[in-house]
Amino acid sequence: MKLNLGCANVLLPDFVNVDVGPPADMIADLTLPWPWPASSVEYAMAHDIIEHLPDRIHTMNELWRVLVPGGKVEIIVPSASKGAGFAQDPTHKSQWCMNSFQYYQAGSFAVGRRAANYGITARFNIVEGPTETPYMDAY
């Protein structure tokens, strides 16, 4: 299964397009336990969605739980280090920057030292990035 999380109006073929309301294929509240079984998702696309979810640990743990071993997730967020991208939108509930993902990376300093204390179960391998989404102006 492939998930397009926070799809809004972008319905992709061959994906389960997920959002909090229509026109999504599946309506789901991602602040709750996710409705997919463990190890059932091969690929998840999360473009401009996870910053709208209040609990970063819950979000990353659920992504990890639903992915099959070797599954992939592609995440794009506005970086808090850039300021306006995150701060201007009142619907953003969590801040992310490039280093945020280290806390969910297998073998990282953050996972080794504190993961269990905070309930972090996700153990991703970052295979590309993180990179910052560029801010561009059209002239």
Question: Which positions does each model-derived feature cover?
Answer:
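Conserved SAM-binding loop
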Residues: 2-82
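S-adenosyl-L-methionine-dependent methyltransferase catalytic module, highlighting the catalytic core
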Residues: 54-64, 68, 72-139
